[in-house]
Amino acid sequence: MRKELHCPQIIKDGKTIGYGGDQEWFPGDFQRLAGCGSVTGSNIAAIYALSREDFKDLYPIKDSQKAADYEQYLNLMQTMYRYMKPGFMGYPLIGRFAKDFKRYAKDHGITLSSEQLFLPQSREQALDFILPALKEDHPVAFLILRHPAHELREDNWHWVTITGFDEEEEKLIWSHCGECEEIDWNMLFDTDKKYYVGIVKFKEEE
């Protein structure tokens, strides 16, 4: 089975410049350096808003046809940054991410609950946490604190947005700095290596 949620393809001057947002679009130096958490929050908000009528207020724009417009998306990112403002060490806390995103949602009339998984002990534990959420149309926030894989050498201390999966290929699909990437989950959750990751997912509060 392969499934991919609708992550906005961001358009600027008639050209596609991003699969979701990119922290390099922020105007401030520190925002560009440490704004990945708020980009992931923005991606999750936009995916929810564009796929569910009852969640549309998470991306409050008057014309949904302009949801992929660069200026509109940057405005969402700037708003989310005020909720997820990083400290001098960045924003490396899954509990804080969950709390801040739920606060953003609450301020927009939507009550969410969250679950967090830190340092999954096996590939199976990680996938049992991630895949059911995606199958139920919930994007997943993923924090890479430290990972020894060569493929992830540029991605330590970084948030990405998981938007899909391919069970046959054994890959996760995510938005990373505005790029759509497919990542081998056997590499990502290789228990022979010491890695530090955290995962956050949301759902409607019952």
Q: Over which residues does each language-model region extend?
A:
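Structural recognition of the beta-strand scaffold that forms the well-ordered cores
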Residues: S113-S114, V140-L143, I173
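Active-site-adjacent structural segments surrounding the nucleophilic cysteine of cysteine proteases
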Residues: M1-I94
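Short, amphipathic alpha-helical segments
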Residues: G35, Y91-G95, P120-E124, E136, ...
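Active-site signature of cysteine proteases
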Residues: R123-F129, A133-E136, L145-E206
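Internal catalytic-core helix/loop-beta-alpha segment
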Residues: R103-E136
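Short, basic/glycine-rich phosphate-binding loops at helix/coil junctions
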Residues: L74-R82, K99-L112
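Extracellular structured ligand-interaction cores
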Residues: L33, P139, W159
